[in-house]
C-alpha cells in the first residue's frame, strides 16, 4: 500500500525573482554586471544555501583564505568535526544501542541477580503486577515468548492496570504512581558548556593574548623603573581592559547559548493525543507514562517503547534507530514499537511499556550531546568580510609598527615633555624595551580594532533575539538559516485548510436520499436504513472518537477538524457511535490517502456480512458510484441523477464549501482474504459503490488573512494557494482571502488542477509555474513539482505543509513551514520553522522577522565599519607623521567593547518595522554592503577623520592650550580626541538604525534596550574620562570641552540627513572592486 498522509494539504506559491536590491530598491539596468558578480564560482564565501549543504562544501570556505583568530571567529558557527562525528554516530546507532543494552542488563544482573532469559514470573513494581526490569527487557529484546508468558498484550495491560480501549484513569495520583514505579518519559541531558568554558574560548583570541603578554612586560618594566605605585598603571590598565573584553564576550556568548538551549527544549516538547478514562486528551510527550494507550496515525512519532494493541496497515519507519531506510510492518506477529520511530502508513493503538531512560531512544539521547551549531549563509559571508577586513587591519598595523620603530630608532619621536625618546648610546636598555613594548602594543591594538570580531556576534545576537520574539509571534525556528532566508522569500506556497481558513468545520449542507435536505442534520426525511448505513460508515471509517462524560455533560468529539465535523453531523442524525463499533468490527482499512483523496474500511457484521465504506472528495467518490439510496431506502441507478449531484457539488464548492461524499458497497465473505498476510495486501474494492450522502463543510476564512496577503503583495512576495480541495472551492477561498483579485483572473493557468500540472513536461511546468496562483486537487507530489519549477525559475520559495507526504516539498523548499497544530511529526522534522497557531498571518510575521535579521546585520556593519575606518586612518596618519597615536591601547579596547558587544547588542535587537515590508525581497546574493551603506559610512568616516585629525595637529591652538604645560596640554588634546571620537560613535548609532530613512529616531521608544545601551555607554565614558584618568590615559575635561565633544558627535545627525540626499549609483560598488581581479584572473587563465 502506498504511503499516505493526513487529511490536511499543503499550499505552494511563488513570484517573480528580485535578485538585486539596494536596501530594498528595485532591479537596475546594470543587472548583467551585478549578476556576473553574484555568480562567481571562485568565491569561497559564496554559499547561498546551507540547508542541504554537504560538510565538504561548508569546510571549503574555511580553508580558502587566511583567517585571523579562527578559534574565536568561528565560535558561532558549525563545528564540522562534531558534525562528521555525529553522522558516524548515527550510522552506528543500532550497534551503540545494543552495547548500552548489554551493559545495562549486565549491571542489573550484577546488582539484582537477574538471570538472562529467565522465565521466572515477574515480581511486582509498586501496586502493579509486573516488574520494571522484565518489562523493559521484554520490549528492548522484542521477546515474543515473554509477551506470551504475560498473557499477550491484554495480559500486560491487565498487569499494568490499564484498559486497552479507555487507557488509564485521568486521576493525577495514578499518573504520579506510574512515574514513581516505571519512570518518567524524560532522559538526562548532557550538560552544556558552563560559563568558564565560554571564558576560556574568549581567552583564545590571539590578539588579546599578545596584548596580555605586552601588558605583563610593560607591567614588569614599569614597576622596575618607576616603582610599584606608578609603574603598574600602563601595563595594569591594558591587562584590565583585556580581561574586561574577555569577560563581556564570555557573558554575551553564555547568554546566547542559554537562549538557544531553551529554544531546543521547546522543539523537543511534542504534543500528542492519549486515551485516558475513555476520552482523547492532548499531553506533552514528557507526561506519557507506562500503561498509556496512544493512538498512532501517519506521520506521528512513536513517543515511547510499547506493544501494538490493534492496527490497520501500520508501517513504521525505524531508520532513526537502525540507520537503515526500511519500512517495517507491524501486526500481532511483530507488535513491538520503538520510541523515536515514525509512523509511515496506517493507523493503530499502542500500549506504552517503557519510557524515558528505559527505552533505547532515551539511552541514545542521553548519550549523545546535541549541538546547536549550524552554518548560515549570512555567517559564511560575514566571516569572509571579517577575514578581508582583518587582513587589511593586520597590514595597516604592520605598516604602523614599522613606521613607529623607524621613527623611534632614528630619534624623530618625542615624549610628552618634548624630549627626544631615543638617543643612541644614551637611552638605557630598559627604556628602549619599554618604549618598544608600547609601540608594539599600539600596533596590536590597531589589529584589535580593525578585526571586526563583532560581526559573527551580531549574527548570533540578532538570530537569538529574533527566534525568541518569533516564539511570541507563534513561530518556532528549527533551523537558524531559515530566519535569514525568509527575508529573501519571493513566494509563499500556502496550504488552504487551517492556514488560510480557521479549521473550524461544520456541515452546513447535505444531499441524501437523492435530494437536498432542508436541514443539514435533520434525519426526519430519511429512511432508517439509509441513516443506519451513513452512521456505520461514519463511525467506523474514522480515526476520531465520541466521548460521553459519566456526569452527563456535553458530548466530546475528537479527531481531525473534518472528521469532527462529520462525526458531529452524524451524531445529530442519530448515530450510536459506541453501539456501532461494538456490533461490527473493522477487518481491513485503507487510511485516507492524499493521492487518492479518499479512505475506506471493510466492516464485518456478525459472522457473514461484509460492508465496505468509503469517504472522500465528493466528485472522486461520485465517479465510483453506480447507485444511490433514495429517501425510501431503496437502491436506484445513479445515471439519471449524476448530473444533479455534479451540479450540487459545484454549487457548494462555489460557496467555498468542502464537499465530502459517503458511499458503501457489500462484499461476499468468500471474496475476503482469510489469512492476515493476504488481508494486509488486499486492495479494497472501490467500484460499484452506493452513494449515501454528500455533505458541504464550511471552513471560514481566518480573520486578518486578507490583510496579510495584501502585505505580502506590497512586499513583493507572491502568495499561491495549493490545496487538495475542489478547484471551485479553492477559487472561492482565494477570492475571499485576496489571493485572487477578481473572477476575471480565475482562468488557466492562473488556477489549475494538480493533475493538469503534473502531466506537463518539465520545461512546460517551469513556464506555467510562474503564472500559477491557485492549484486545486493537488497531491503532495504536485506541490513538490511546483516548488522545483519555481526554484529553477530563480524564486526563493517558502512552503507550508502538515502531512507526512509533504515532507519532500518542505525539504526541497528554501524555507519549509510546518503546522504546529495539524502538522505531523514527520512534517515538523522536515521543516525549518513550525507555525504554532497554523495561521497564515504568522507566516507573514516570519517574513518580517527574516527581513529584520538581514537589516539589523547591515545596520551593525555600517556602524562598525565607520569606527574601523575612522580609527585606522586617525592612528595611521598620526603615527606616520608624529610617531605617536592619539588613541591609546586602553582607549581602543574600550572603543572595541562599544563596537563588538554593546553596539552589536543595541543594533541587533532592533524590532522589525512596517518599512521593511515596503521593500522587495532581499536578493539571495545581494552585496552585504549596499551602495547606500557605503555612502553613509564614508560620509561619517570622512567627517570623523577630518575633525579628529584637525584636533590632533592643531588642537593645542584651537583649544587654547598653548600657554599650558606642554605635557598636560598634549594629554588634554588627546583626551578631547578620544572623547569626541566616542561621542561620534554614540550619536552615529542612531544613524545606523535607519540607513535609508531621514528620521533616525522613528521607533526608538520601542527598543528600550537600545536607549539603555546608549545611556550606559555615555555614563561609562564620563566615568572613564573623569575618574579613571591614570587607567585610561585621560585627564579631566572642563564643561566647555565636554560640550564641544558632544557637539562634534551631534553634527553626525544633520550630516547624515545631508548625506542621504546624495544619489548613489545603482550598480553595487563591489562590481567595481571585483572587475579588475576578474579580468586579471581571466588573462592568467587565457
UniProtKB/Swiss-Prot annotation:
Subcellular location: Membrane
Reaction equation(s) it catalyzes: Ca(2+)(in) + ATP + H2O = Ca(2+)(out) + ADP + phosphate + H(+)
Compositional bias (Low complexity): 1-15
EC id: 7.2.2.10
Highest taxon above the source species: Eukaryota
Active-site residues (renumbered): 495 (4-aspartylphosphate intermediate)
Membrane topology: Multi-pass membrane protein
Segments of this protein annotated with the region Disordered: 1-50
Domain-related comment: The N-terminus contains an autoinhibitory calmodulin-binding domain, which binds calmodulin in a calcium-dependent fashion.
UniProt-listed NCBIfam families: ATPase-IIB_Ca (TIGR01517), ATPase_P-type (TIGR01494)
Residue numbers on the Lumenal membrane side: 216-233, 403-439, 877-887, 952-963, 1029-1038
GO BP terms, alphabetized: double fertilization forming a zygote and endosperm; pollen development
InterPro entries, sorted: ATPase_P-typ_cation-transptr_C (IPR006068), ATPase_P-typ_cation-transptr_N (IPR004014), ATPase_P-typ_cyto_dom_N (IPR023299), ATPase_P-typ_P_site (IPR018303), ATPase_P-typ_TM_dom_sf (IPR023298), ATPase_P-typ_transduc_dom_A_sf (IPR008250), Ca_ATPase_N_dom (IPR024750), HAD-like_sf (IPR036412)
Family: Belongs to the cation transport ATPase (P-type) (TC 3.A.3) family. Type IIB subfamily.
Basic and acidic residues: compositionally biased ranges: 16-42
Keyword annotations from UniProtKB, A to Z: ATP-binding, Calcium, Calcium transport, Calmodulin-binding, Ion transport, Magnesium, Membrane, Metal-binding, Nucleotide-binding, Translocase, Transmembrane, Transmembrane helix, Transport
Keyword Transport assigned: yes
Keyword Manganese: no
Activity regulation, free text: Activated by calmodulin.
All ranges on the Cytoplasmic side of the membrane: 1-194, 255-382, 458-857, 909-928, 989-1006, 1061-1086
Protein's recorded name: Calcium-transporting ATPase 9, plasma membrane-type
